[in-house]
Amino acid sequence: MNLKSTGKLTLAANPLFALLLIMLLLCPHEALAAGNIEYLQPKPLYDCDTLKGVHLKPVKGGVLKIPLITWPGDVATIYTDQLGLFKKEGLDVQLFLENDFAKQVKAVLEGETPLLRGTMGMVNAAAETFAKQGTELVVLYQLTWSTGGDCLVVRPGVKSLTDLKGKNVALQLYGPHMDYLTTVLKKAGLRPTDVHARWLKELSVPAYDTHGKIVDPRSAFEAAADLDGAMVISPDANALTSGGTGTGAEGSVRGARVLFSSKSANRVISDVYAVRADYFKANRARVERFVHALMLGQEQFSKLLANKSSDQGAYKKLVSRSAELLFGSPQAVADVEGSLGGDCEWVGYSGNVSFFTGAGTTRTFAKLKDEIQSSFLELGLLKSKAPLQTAGWDYKAMAAGLANSKVAVAPKQAFDPTKAQRQVEKEIASGVGKWEKEGSLYSFEIYFAPRQAGFTAAQYSDAFKKALELSQTLGGTLITIEGHNSPDALNKAKADGKSDTQIALIEQAAKNLSYQRAIAVRQAYLDFCKQAGVPVDESQFLAVGMGTSSPKFPVPKTEEQWNANRRVVFRVKSVETELDSFKPSGK
């Protein structure tokens, strides 16, 4: 038989083909898929293909085009339009969806719209691009904080944030997770470059045909075993982890879990509107009316969400319109409603005043701008720091027509102190080593002298500032304040052959004393926060007496080691997976 003429092959006739076939059969599916991942090189936004050859043009007159992205925060903007509040402010507007941030930047540069919609991280990444074109960006309005919609999924070997050092993490380039990752790494004492960021084009699995290429973090994490983590949106996190711990079935990754989400780091991802500075200068009153309409609309939107059962007509109309604008189909109501269940917090008037003026918070525009741009310089996402302004609104005037214009209201109680104390004691009893490692995002220590009972802000101001910054950034975490005693008396009792009863009494006395010290430190810290003018959720801070259960040096040999055992540890704990054991009933 003439094999060539028939177009058929046999293994015997083609040894090379046979070898290739055997290699393919032996090669795991994951390895084959991993080879299709299309990673990108980090570079400033102005260097991306979309913006090559783009130049600044005057903003077109007429209709004000308002960009949206597929995020629950933008549902409030849609409701503002539905209520006719933009028209009442004398604005003729057109809402449009653009999830490709580079395309948004292109539209603003070319004058299609003066408005840019993104997170603070994305807007800071764009600031250098506008500076190179001879203008700047002005941040006008904060829509939301992400409070659950963004997650870090990890493989079983990663137990804490510090375990990420030297590891590979997938995330979208120019997307909302750039500063999310760098901020939480810094809070854990790591530098942005301590983690190997693997950049991808898309935020989530794209709807278009990628021709076999993997271009998003979820798909990359599923395909590549060398990825230790992935920054993903909550639906992708649920898929990868099977809603808890990945089983390896139905697109999940065996053993994968959410290390933390923006439910814990709930003051990191800030969604905002910005405007071209040249347009703002020429049209300040018009832009102010735009922001005022957003504030009025957000207040009405919050009222609708609270009373949707009694106003189903308006609610269904909003959800249908949002589904059409944000998901491309008025039938996608489940996607809209699913996103309204806790992915974000709409900040409203009070939140805008706090964010832009610093009233009652450390998580301000200026703070985020500085930490984001510093991190982006390290990662090569910026070549130099870029100007980014605020509008400098008169917020008293902006409050006109609002039902609620209070600022710096004390935060809601997130945890039930009794339930939290009981759960923490239970977890410590199951193993101190496990308690100190699993779920611990970060910890730091202060030290005290023998028989010291009092603790003041003057003594520990640096530590208290650090604790305040951590609690403000990671507002969904529990921060335990753990008292630790030196084991000297216990060691002596054991050496002297004391009875088990006597040893138990010494251990209990040490635990009681360490608890009293933890309480004293907690109170001194809360007093410090009051003096700083920053309202805090006191339930976030839990005093714990560790006694002699976890000495740094079980048998200290030097005075330095002896002193190091007398300490109070501030420990930031993620409690997302067991939240019912900590939160007040009905919340």
Predicted regions and their residues:
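Short, glycine-/small- and polar/acidic-enriched structural segments
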Residues: 34-213, 217-234, 255-261
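Periplasmic OmpA-like peptidoglycan-binding domain that tethers envelope proteins to the cell wall
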Residues: 485-582, 586
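Bacterial N-terminal signal peptides
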Residues: 14-28
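N-terminal hydrophobic or amphipathic helices and topogenic motifs
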Residues: 32-94, 346-432
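Secondary-structure end/capping motifs
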Residues: 281-384
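Periplasmic peptidoglycan-binding/tethering modules of Gram-negative envelope proteins
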Residues: 400-480, 488-501, 573-587
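Sec-exported extracytoplasmic/periplasmic mature domains
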Residues: 82-85, 91, 109-113, 128, ...
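Pocket-lining segment of extracytoplasmic ligand-binding domains
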Residues: 120-122, 130-131, 200, 204-326
